[in-house]
Amino acid sequence: MILNKVAKCYGKQIGFFGNKTTQFIKPNQTIFLIGGTKRLFTTQQQQSPKKEEPKSEQQKKVEDKTEEKEKEKDEEENENEKEKENEDGEGQKKKSKFNVPPIVTSVTSTFFAGVLVASTFGYLTYNFKKDISEEERYRLNSVESKFYHSIAEPFREFFDNIFENLRTKYEFFDMLFGPGKIHKVLPPPLPGGKKYTLVIDIDALTEITKTSKYPTLYKRAGLDFFLDHLRKDYEIYLYFNGNIPQNKYEQLQFKIDTNGKYFTGLLYPETGIKERNQFSKKIEMLDRDPSKVIFIDAASPYDHPNVINIGKFKSNSKDKLLIELLPVLESFSRKNLDDVRPEISQFQNISKQSLTKNLEDYLSTHNINSRQKK
């Protein structure tokens, strides 16, 4: 503002006003006297750009290196981004491949839920009034008694039978769960009773026809003589296998032992003394000393330390094995053997013909008189 006033008052003297032309100084302009000439400059005079100094070779090299490094970094970042994108794409593809249909998940969850419910129900049913006495059974109310007798007890027996069969078939069951509980199938031996026990399959003693309503029984040669002599030193038990109907047991027993003097007792398939048509090796269930137990079987030969297999009897055959075997068994009790198993090992896993020969050799070797010669 001050400069404008000065210009107005002394413009002519300074020389800014000439030829009747008036020039006013703007607020942002300044008057300078340069080389005898008057020039008008703005306060915001633009400075001329400075000339760039030439760069040295070292600076150029440094700049080139930095540029190369930046390019490399950019390239690495681009590659990493591409790899991540590829990985994400592959992951999505895998996820899409392994996507489980909803129906499968629903079926699986339903199955496992059913297994859980069934196992819980089975466990509770198995343990329902498991080890109660007869008096406690009598005190059960009507609902408990009906559930106990119609569901719990049959289910428990069914499960125990399956488990025992698996335990017998697969040894690792004993390793996992320990030896099973052995149920005694015979009463305890009487003090001062007979020292040896003989268990005979009915097929080894007789042939039973099933062509009529009333079965016909054919006795093996020398059966009565065989049993009558051995009953003095042996407990003799007759085993009824699963081929014979249960309602025929008493009838057949009466035909074999009319006076009831031969057999100490009877054994049935339910006792488990035979497994898959073979006498069990768990002789402890007889509650007798295993070293003094002999099984006489009619099945195909198999490995068992206590079994003498004499084969099935056929009524049309001339079979005298019982008469040949009798003196051998009598010699065991007469010698008061502590263990019969080493003696009977030479009569195992052989055919009928070989058994007859081995019996004769045993009698001659031990100077035992044959009943057949008498």
From Swiss-Prot:
Region (Disordered): 42-97
Principal cellular location given in the protein's record: mitochondrion
Keywords assigned by UniProt, alphabetized: Membrane, Mitochondrion, Mitochondrion inner membrane, Protein transport, Transit peptide, Translocation, Transmembrane, Transmembrane helix, Transport
Matching Pfam families: NIF
The keyword Nucleotide-binding is assigned to this record: no
UniProt similarity note: Belongs to the TIM50 family.
Protein name: Mitochondrial import inner membrane translocase subunit tim50
Source species of the chain: Dictyostelium discoideum
